[in-house]
A protein has these predicted regions:
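Transition-metal
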Residues: 2-178
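Catalytic-pocket segment enriched in acidic/His residues
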Residues: 180-182
Length: 182
């Protein structure tokens, strides 16, 4: 596919008219160097380490994403969803930037000026490190945005549980109850 870098608005409008309002998105595969893939996200096993062993195995499939990953050594477009039109592709980020409220609706466009969410299939063999996703209010306190993602674990893709369905949380010695609440 030829990658189009700019001026995608007319392509988007033509595709929306031709498909009754749909844009086809290619899968956005995301590797994680610190987790073991569960191999249930409809990626051929030979492609699990397509980015190289140093990058880790692909264990996430992002949907409708205009967000790049925060992975070390990532490709510039890692995490971005691509719209596929004929033999061309362009990022959903580009499409939203050029088409605005046509794609995301007036209220979302007015409030955020972008598409602020994405979803993912998330598939690991073992437990993930305990972590939290801050709300917009919490994240603003440290100069960040809230984490705009959701998880879905479809039962038809999870007929076998992972090999250790637990997670652990530890606190720095001296951490107070008030600090945890904060």
């Amino acid at each position: 596919l030829k990658t189009v870098k700019n001026k995608v608005k007319s392509r988007v409008e033509t595709e929306l008219a031709a498909t009754g309002g749909l844009l086809r998105l290619a899968p956005a595969w995301v590797p994680r160097s610190f987790l073991q893939p569960g191999l249930r996200i409809k990626l051929h096993p030979d492609d699990t380490y397509a980015y190289g062993l140093n990058r880790g195995g692909i264990d996430e499939r992002w949907f409708a994403s205009t967000t790049v990953t925060a992975n070390e050594g990532r490709a510039d477009d890692e995490g971005l969803s691509y719209c596929v039109v004929g033999k061309e592709r362009f990022t959903l980020h580009q499409a939203v930037a050029e088409c605005g409220s046509t794609l995301v609706g007036r209220s979302i466009w007015r409030k955020y000026g972008k598409w602020p969410v994405y979803s993912k299939f998330f598939d690991n063999m073992g437990p993930i490190p305990h972590h939290m996703h801050q709300s917009a209010k919490q994240a603003k306190l440290v100069g960040q945005e809230g984490k705009p993602e959701s998880y879905y674990f479809p039962p038809q893709h999870n007929n076998v549980g992972n090999n250790f369905p637990y997670t652990f949380m530890g606190l720095e010695p001296g951490t107070t109850k008030a600090q945890v609440r904060q």
